[in-house]
Regions:
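Active-site neighborhoods and metal-handling regions in enzymes and metal-associated proteins
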Residues: 1-352
Length: 352
């Protein structure tokens, strides 16, 4: 099915074949989980080229492709296979191929090389049932990790302690790793939207923003919760309530048929109406799947239309330099008539 859809896209882009070098796209199209190899797909043929280390693995994991072990360089093997396929124009993934690599391909491959982008990424936006099973499990593990960490956080421990405990807990649940460098931003560091865990000690009266996820079977979850350690100030509680109301409004309103711009506007307009528009400077959300950030974007620039089986985050935040910040994030699945939450952790302000 994936090859059929890809071949339809090749026609649209007027190329005879696509050279897949982006590792996420390679995994999506072939199921191969190793770290070296490229795929070349034409209208009638599909070949996967890898080296001695991965031939056996490729033969086990990949269906529908010829597996070729390159003896010369991988680029020379691509040139050879392209000749055999008799293709005139090959699309290459311009957003992924470094210029130096392109020069080597240009020198060896006789077919015309045409820069293309977003072909496989577009297919990846709409999830299959198999993908959704994995994404839901990744979300559940993140929820369980949040429950666990709430009993661990206390004054005097560092942000790094919290990040390490989160990662260790998730790995014990069978994940490969966290989805990305875990964000633990306490106190005034909460004003940093991407405040990766530091050696700062967590103190009483602070809010702590936890942004993390699980990389499970190749797919990721991405959840954010902000908790209080001891009683927070009225100001901090106030921005918490605004952020939560904005996030809940977006969850209620987002449905298929709207653009990323429209989906972004619900939380943004609400936060603006409360006087914090300037303090919410990032987009409302992004697609999740094999990558932490993929299409579609829920942002003031995104024309992409939401359709069922897309999976996205909804994560408004308010950041006050010198004071602190709040972000609340869930992963959702776009359904036929609205959306379904994949992350279910409580969003009331927990006082730990």
């Amino acid at each position: 099915v994936k090859l059929t859809k890809l071949r339809e896209a090749l026609k649209e882009h007027s190329v005879d074949a696509l050279l897949i070098t982006n590792p996420y796209n390679r995994r999506y199209m072939t199921g191969f989980t190793g770290s070296a190899g490229v795929a070349l797909v034409s209208m009638t043929d599909a070949v996967f080229i890898t080296d001695f280390r991965y031939t056996e693995q490729a033969e086990k994991q990949i269906e529908g492709y010829r597996i070729v072990e390159h003896k010369k360089t991988i680029i020379e093997e691509v040139a050879e296979q392209a000749k055999q396929m008799n293709v005139q124009t090959i699309g290459f993934e311009k957003d992924h191929m470094p210029f130096g690599t392109y020069e080597q391909y240009h020198e060896k491959v006789t077919a015309d090389l045409k820069p293309v982008s977003g072909i496989v990424e577009k297919l990846r936006m709409v999830k299959t049932e198999d993908e959704l099973v994995i994404l839901k499990q990744a979300a559940k593990i993140a929820d369980d990790a949040f429950t666990h960490i709430c009993s661990y956080i206390k004054p005097g421990i560092t942000e790094l302690d919290v990040a390490t405990e989160l990662e260790f807990f998730m790995r014990k649940q069978g994940v490969t790793s966290s989805s990305f460098d875990i964000i633990v931003a306490s106190g005034i560091r909460g004003a940093l939207p991407h405040g990766v865990a530091s050696s700062k000690k967590i103190e009483s009266g602070e809010l702590v923003t936890l942004d993390f996820g699980a990389l499970y079977n190749g797919y990721i979850s991405d959840i954010t919760r902000t908790v209080a350690v001891g009683e927070p100030s009225e100001k901090l509680r106030g921005i918490y309530d605004v952020t939560l109301a904005a996030q809940e409004l977006a969850l209620k309103m987002i449905k298929p048929g709207m653009t990323g711009i429209e989906a972004d506007a619900f939380a943004r307009d609400y936060i603006k109406s409360k006087g914090y528009g300037e303090q919410f400077g990032h987009s409302t959300g992004h697609g999740i799947g094999l990558e932490v950030h993929e299409g579609p974007a829920l942002s003031f620039r995104s024309e992409t239309v939401l359709v069922p089986n897309m999976t996205v985050t909804v994560e408004p935040g308010i950041y006050l330099p010198g004071i602190g910040g709040v972000r609340i994030e869930d992963d959702i699945l776009i359904t036929a008539d609205g959306n379904e939450r994949l992350t279910h952790s409580t969003k009331e302000l927990l006082i730990l």
